Amino acid sequence: MVYYPYYEDIKMSVKQVIIMRKDLNMRKGKMIAQACHATMKNLLDHSYTNIDLSIAPFLSIELDDDVREWLQSGFTKICLYVDSEADLYTAYQVARDAGLRVSMIEDNGTTEFNGVKTNT
C-alpha cells in the first residue's frame, strides 16, 4: 500500500493505493480486513508518534501535510490487484524507490493460508 500523489486538473491530490494479491483467492471479508490493516499500518508507520500502543485510549499522532490532506479530502483510495507475491514485491520496491510511503501486510495465517504467514 502506498500514498500516491495524483495530478488532476493541475491540482495535486493525495490518494492511497492498496495493492492486493489475486493469486491468494481470499474471501471478500478477508480482503477487506487486509485492506483495513494496510490502511492503518501505513498511517501509523508514517506518522510521528510518541505513544505506547498498549495504551490505545491515549493515542496521539502528529500528521505530516500529505497525510493531513488525504484525511481532509475524503480518504480517497485506489484498489489494484497483482497476480503473484513476486509482483507484489516489485510494486512495493518501485513505490519505495520512488519515495512513496509503503507498508507490507503479513497475515498470520490464522483464518486462511493453512497457518502459513503470507504477504497479502
Predicted regions and their residues:
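Positively charged, small/polar-rich N-terminal and surface patches that mediate targeting and assembly
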Residues: 1-120
